[in-house]
């Protein structure tokens, strides 16, 4: 717990138990409901100005814990925002175009609103669902961090561009203060020289921003 108390927390993607259902998110969520783990996370975020990032299954874990969009670990109910099965009912794996909709998060200190990136996505349960009221509130607060967009940079519900059918074309969400970020796209898969045949910018500089935040 000492390490959790002192630094950033990263919830990575990764299959577990056949990835059905909820992938490794269910195990993350169970572990972090532990009273001592919960206390350590809350102290990290509230007292030590820490950061947390969840990608793919890690994003699912953040949603299940309430860290996004609430910014704290809270009990979930049937009306809580969630990530559920892709609209096509199966796993998808492709490169999607995503737009920075809000850069209020320290994780996005090196990008600008309306920047567009080509980001790998690979998941079976990435469709963001929330009530209309909740969705409007998140958009108004700038908590919808990234969106799936078409070739013109417009948020899209077209399956060619929004592969899971997320409401508001949401690909990533953040906590109210931006220090907790969850996203479905695998920004960590960027390596210089990789995906040479795929057009577009691929480096969101997430980890560069995360390091610079503490300097």
Where are these regions (language model features)?
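Generic, low-specificity signal for short hydrophobic/alpha-helical stretches with a mild N-terminal bias
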Residues: 10, 23, 44, 80, ...
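Cysteine-nucleophile active-site neighborhood
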Residues: 16-106
């Amino acid at each position: 717990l000492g390490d959790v108390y002192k630094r950033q927390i990263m919830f990575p993607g990764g299959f577990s138990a056949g990835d059905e259902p909820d992938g490794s998110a269910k195990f993350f969520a169970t572990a972090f409901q532990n009273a001592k783990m919960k206390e350590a996370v809350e102290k990290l975020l509230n007292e030590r100005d820490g950061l947390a990032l969840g990608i793919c299954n890690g994003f699912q874990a953040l949603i299940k814990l309430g860290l996004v969009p609430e910014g704290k670990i809270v009990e979930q109910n049937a009306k809580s925002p969630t990530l559920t099965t892709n609209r096509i009912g199966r796993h998808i794996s492709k490169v999607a175009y995503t737009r920075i909709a809000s850069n209020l998060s320290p994780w996005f200190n090196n990008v600008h609103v309306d920047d567009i990136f080509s980001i790998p996505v690979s998941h079976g349960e990435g469709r963001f669902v929330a009530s209309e009221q909740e969705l409007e509130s998140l958009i108004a607060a700038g908590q919808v961090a990234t969106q799936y967009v078409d070739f013109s940079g417009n948020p899209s519900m077209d399956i060619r561009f929004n592969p899971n059918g997320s409401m508001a074309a949401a690909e990533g969400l953040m906590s109210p203060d931006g220090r907790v970020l969850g996203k479905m796209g695998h920004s960590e898969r960027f390596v210089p020289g990789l995906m040479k045949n795929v057009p577009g910018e691929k480096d969101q500089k997430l980890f560069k921003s995360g390091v610079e935040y503490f300097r």
